């Protein structure tokens, strides 16, 4: 779709150009507003949608900026100040006025009237400067007069620098003898707002103020110190990769590098320019980010790897496109670090230091950037990143304050539920939300328009489009069908193995399966999911058996049966309960081992038995401590308690079923055991914090009570819990570091991810309640397994 064309007669040959070149036509694709979610339908062909998304990796479409194109059109020729340097831009303005007299984006948002006013006035100034397009000028002036009230309307989105740039353009209009009939009171309000903004800026001596003024230099008038602006010139000749600022700088100083930048932009895009250029790295990272956040990245692994490698090369080279833009830097850091690349957090720390050390905020950092920086600041892996810890806490407080004061109502992205996104980021940190939970929330909060706003609005299909949404919804629902069938299979398995006859045991098959489906959701990983879920059910049964259901004789009998393995259950089981539990254990271990043998090419039965024995021994030790009423040291307690937390049988056998080969050397390596210990320690401590009061009433020990006791009872419960949380934080960060690290790693990444997935599971289960007693979990389970996403519900 092209911009609406004027019916007026075009000017002479020297201003003519083809209506829209191929390059600018591709720009106009970005101007189209994507179909709204209410009207979108799931594609009839899954592969066609994937194909359209794959093409985004090979092009970076950016919407036309009429505002920036107007400023480029104002640039005089280097050889004659009486002629335009870029007549094609001028002709583009003549051809692309809307029927209402504005130069607006097609289907522009009703909250973008200030943007439309600014763009329209800039186009009028460009035409008037070169004495062409009288009819278009008059229609444009009429539009400005009719809509001038929007310039001071509080409900409208205010582009960056609007309160300074727009009044400056009005001054320029008067200087060019343009007769604008404006309502005096509204004009005075506008001037008052400009003076307030200038006063606010002048009260700050921060570097950010200087950057802000340089960025909006076209609105600062002839008194502006252009030489000071040029210190922000980038290697590509631009100022802030912004055509309008760069055009104004060339007009003032005739800087050849500025001109080269503008020429290159027009060479690429034809007769109209975008609001920001280049934006390749950010656009590609947005594509990757969309795919990862919506759960469909596995369909584009080759393309994503190429983007990551190229971004990492740019990072190592100190590319200005990354490091001169806070949003791109934060997005690059988070994406690279989460994908195992070795990147320092120093640039993020620097951005945060500049933000918090400045008293002048709110102009250069939009809501999207703030959220990106917050997400990046969560990825703390190393002890020496202490500054990042403090900055993350401060930024979290800032976001909470903005939420409570409705500070995000005016979002930098139209149609985006920024409040919901910020609330999710705060309430569910990345380590405390299971993968599928996060994906569903991201789908529900997704905005296909994704218009961004700086000095003017701009968008790109790489930022967001209906294909991302429709593919993710269809994929989520496809997986959900498989998950529902697997849950039915698990429920049949419970009955077939008579586990439902154990009256002492909690019935938690749905929750156990949910934790598997919410983390390892891909259809091809069915065996790993079922291993995880079945062992989850069995560990719950065994835990209840040791806790309330079995006598000491029965517990010892169960251990002995697993040790002997090849036994006659009809004669060697001391009770029906022991027979049911051991038979279910043996049947399940053999089933998993058979599947593992096919994938691994070697027997894994003995290892799975050993994993279960480790758990049984640790549970027996806890039972004996309870009988003896003895109190171990904290170290003694934790050396056993991380094993008795019972994550071993759930996670470790599943490692054999996710794809990669796991040799005997790998499972005996220290990395394997360290990952298990870190994951299990986090779970144990979270459990002990949540269950502290209950355990205390029952006369049982926990990490919290032992810590208080080991410190002579001289510290409070709150202090003990605070220490436990610090311990969890340290181990969680070390776990994530090991999972992401590739250079010195022995275990395949697909296997290491399961340790992290389980860490998120325990954070969810114990975030507010004691594990399975969480009232909110029922709704979450339904959302992941039972309730499909309906596209028209958004």
UniProtKB/Swiss-Prot annotation:
Q: In which pathway does it act?
A: Secondary metabolite biosynthesis; terpenoid biosynthesis; Plant hormone biosynthesis; gibberellin biosynthesis
Q: Which PANTHER family match?
A: ENT-COPALYL DIPHOSPHATE SYNTHASE, CHLOROPLASTIC (PTHR31739), ENT-KAUR-16-ENE SYNTHASE, CHLOROPLASTIC (PTHR31739:SF3)
Q: What is the protein's name according to its record?
A: Ent-kaurene synthase 1, chloroplastic
Q: As annotated in Swiss-Prot or TrEMBL, what is the tissue specificity of this protein?
A: Accumulates in leaves, and, at low levels, in germinating seeds.
Q: Where are the transmembrane segments?
A: none
> What residues bind Mg(2+) 2, as annotated?
543, 547
| Cofactor binding annotation | Binds 3 Mg(2+) ions per subunit.
Write down the chemical reaction(s) this protein catalyses: ent-copalyl diphosphate = ent-kaur-16-ene + diphosphate
GO biological process terms, semicolon-separated: ent-kaurene biosynthetic process; gibberellin biosynthetic process; terpenoid biosynthetic process
Briefly, what is this protein's role? Involved in the biosynthesis of ent-kaurene diterpenoids natural products such as oridonin, miltiradiene, eriocalyxin B and nezukol, known to exhibit antitumor, anti-inflammatory and antibacterial activities, and in the production of gibberellins phytohormones. Catalyzes the conversion of ent-copalyl diphosphate (ent-CPP) to ent-kaurene.
Chain positions of motif DDXXD motif: 543-547
Span of chain positions assigned to the transit peptide in the UniProt entry:
1-28
* Residues of the signal peptide: none
Which of UniProt's keywords are assigned here? Chloroplast, Lyase, Magnesium, Metal-binding, Plastid, Transit peptide
Cell compartment(s), UniProt: Plastid, Chloroplast
| Disulfide bridge positions per record | none
Provide the binding site for Mg(2+) 3.
687, 695
Assigned protein family? Belongs to the terpene synthase family.
Gene behind this chain? KS1
Q: What is known of its domains?
A: The Asp-Asp-Xaa-Xaa-Asp/Glu (DDXXD/E) motif is important for the catalytic activity, presumably through binding to Mg(2+).
Give the E.C. number(s): 4.2.3.19
What does the record give as cofactor?
Mg(2+)
Upper taxonomic classification of the species? Eukaryota, Viridiplantae, Streptophyta, Embryophyta, Tracheophyta
Broad EC category: lyase
* Pfam families membership: Terpene_synth, Terpene_synth_C
Q: State any GO CC term.
A: chloroplast
